[in-house]
Swiss-Prot record:
This is Isoleucine--tRNA ligase. Its cofactor is Zn(2+). Its main location: cytoplasm. Binds 1 zinc ion per subunit. One of its GO terms (biological process) is isoleucyl-tRNA aminoacylation. One of its GO terms (molecular function) is aminoacyl-tRNA deacylase activity. It comes from Pseudomonas aeruginosa (strain LESB58). It comes from the Bacteria. Keywords: Aminoacyl-tRNA synthetase, ATP-binding, Cytoplasm, Ligase, Metal-binding, Nucleotide-binding, Protein biosynthesis, Zinc. One of its GO terms (cellular component) is cytosol. The keyword ATP-binding applies. SUPFAM superfamilies: Anticodon-binding domain of a subclass of class I aminoacyl-tRNA synthetases, Nucleotidylyl transferase, ValRS/IleRS/LeuRS editing domain. It catalyses: tRNA(Ile) + L-isoleucine + ATP = L-isoleucyl-tRNA(Ile) + AMP + diphosphate.
Amino acid sequence: MTDYKATLNLPETAFPMKAGLPQREPETLKFWNDIGLYQKLRAIGGDRPKFVLHDGPPYANGSIHIGHAVNKILKDIIVRSKTLAGYDAPYVPGWDCHGLPIEHKVETTHGKNLPADKTRELCREYAAEQIEGQKADFIRLGVLGEWDNPYKTMNFANEANEIRALAEMVKQDFVFKGLKPVNWCFDCGSALAEAEVEYADKKSPTIDVGFPVADADKLAAAFGLAALDKPAQIVIWTTTPWTIPANQALNVHPEIDYALVDAGDRYLVLAEALVESCLARYQREGKVVATAKGEALELINFRHPFYERLSPVYLADYVALDAGTGIVHSSPAYGEDDFYTCKRYGMSNDDILSPVQSNGVYVDSLPFFGGQFIWKANPNVVAKLEEVGSLLAHETINHSYMHCWRHKTPLIYRATAQWFVGMDKQPRQGASLRERALEAITQTEFVPGWGQARLHGMIAGRPDWCISRQRNWGVPIPFFLHKASGELHPRTVELMEEVAQRVEKEGIEAWFKLDAAELLGEDAAQYEKINDTLDVWFDSGTTHWHVLRGSHRIGHASGPVADLYLEGSDQHRGWFHSSLLTGCAIDNHAPYRQLLTHGFTVDESGRKMSKSLGNTVVPQTVIDTLGADILRLWVASTDYSGEIAVSQQILQRSADAYRRIRNTTRFLLSNLNGFDPATDLLPPQEMLALDRWAVDRALLLQREIEEAYREYRFWNVYSKVHNFCVQELGGFYLDIIKDRQYTTGANSVARRSCQTALFHIAEALVRWIAPILAFTAEEVWKFLPGERAESVMLATWYDGLSELPADVTLNRQYWEQVMAVKAAVNKELENQRAAKAVGGNLQAEVTLYAEDALQVQLAKLGNELRFVLITSTATLAPLSAAPADAVDSEVAGLKLKVVKSTHAKCGRCWHHREDVGQHAAHPDLCGRCIENIEGSGEVRHYA
């Protein structure tokens, strides 16, 4: 038998079947670096519309985790897709460098007794080391950006511009000093921002405490009685016994009904609705003697249980009936609501009792409990209450309680003198900050949409922003306070600029080593130099101002400087939040046009990632075993708006999907062997009908893919590309064209038409996958025929796809119908193969018994129907002629009959044809193959 292999156009490409991503990806990174890809993109972007994604800075501490990888990959997909869409899309990565975690690391390594300047020096060194490690990991993910010049909040210029941003807010009169309860961590020794608070279960004692009445006559009158014939107590319930020593008032709701209960040896004042549950808790019998509204009890005095002072009754709307007694004990130093209620009743800052020090220990002068740590003092307070006869009940509950996000230890509210940005303070011009921020939220697009209501609720209900911290490693609040009046220096804004100029040269150390006389001269003795530092959320929250307009100047000239902020859903109370407040305070609008939120990673069972559960996925390990492109494909394939599931099994499924896409791409490249688009590309009107359909299908898909990228629906991009590779290409088009591609003349219209379609599809496909499979797309790009830019990222979406006119005979609807018929035939062929009736498809002859309209449609393909169905023979017959053994199909009006061909198999095309063996010179070939190798070649019109 003659070997006709040399007469076939067999596929050939150097593009490897095995990806070898862990080994090959670093070569691509080197290539991008060698050609200066990021710099070239900036050079060609000058005339393009700008799209700015501003990077939310990760904290410069520790290795990156899977959440970091998700975040950076999503950002890179957006930046790359915007670049391909014709935008100038710079990406400046950044790092958050100041704050307690780094200071804590330095103290752990070098001890807590370091001089402050040495602490700052070591913190700066530590942050720089951490940044280098994280940067290498982010680059390895394939993230394209200005890695040689990232922004760092500890850069001198950034520290200086942060001071300038604060000065802008001082200038507009948003900043003030006040005594207020703030979230306080004993381990941090500092106030915490709202975003630094997390909630966890905690066991706490609960106590019911009776405060003896001091104004017995007034209490009797409030309940409509002439007098009281026995002692009376108003009863509070609390989970914080340690706050009792600081009690200064008792709060009732003005509209709640309160009862005077005869409990035997005393009267008890309780909310009427809670009398029964309270008496059960006290194990007492009791009878309601009289009732009164809460407002009737206002300003009646009761006595503190063990100190010689009074606790008046104040009215407060926040008192509720969901637990306790309906009366709230008020320690204004340790509760925000208590604080504001007491202030409303005229209590001055000097009157507020604050016996708990910054380390959680009572001041030594506090009677009974001085020098005790508050959590350890709880049982001692309970014992004292029992001793004086004021303890009515004592239990333990497990409840959700605020904790420090770093130390995982319980927090308290603690009234301290701090610097605040006022939410409702009237600025020099315009609306309050709260009003500005709420209005800005309505002008911002949220992805997903529910983020708008979430952020709106947080802004509407939040207190003033405490921006001061009592730490060493942070940007200073460079204020001078008059020692006598407590007022800021009248030249504060001007002085802040002088400080900023010094910080620009020397960093934050310039302020801490500054002698006040250098700036204030002879007035220095009258002023106190403030050494508080700024909340780290102020650091990151002002990056839009001092990075996009300052150090890198990539933002828009007016309006929001960034088109998009993209972070995890926790940043509604973090970076999104602080950036909104600073943007509205300084510029009177949000710093962003869109906010995109992604969820957190969980395992395939929906559990949080935890080392103790052993379900963590380390991105570096995935990269080393599967490759960064697999990680990127997994991120793209997931609906990130909710929880993002990841496990080894899930990643393996992504690897399987990747192989399908790679194999499809390899098929395209291998069949473009010998194709030069400069000379071989056919215009649409000269192409075969099936090829024109394939290009049209790619065009329709590209429109959908571009829209999905625009709307950040990357999982739709993935599913559309994957389905195109599996179904339209792998399950239909590519199988059909193999015969024509391999067996027709190398330069025939039939083959060049097919190659033209494959070329167009490959050109489009490589761009579709480039934002997601960044490394693989670059690899594919190098193997595509024709002249092209150095990198796929220097191109834009492919514009060579042509639309199939609606008025052609074999239009989109026609091919949809053919695909359905082919699927029905494939199903019957599978059944026949399973029954051993036929071997391969080409051993089969199929007769299609079709109703008239369908028969007319299929007949348009003529003799080429068999090539579409990939059978040796395909015969059309009327449905009425179907024999009893014809099989019904899923296509209406179509029955099928498959039989094994009795003809010999062609040794070249493998079709079973009756003319095989009828040609003496080529006894192994069919007439079609002989025509293709010796004659002018077969002519195809459709497929």
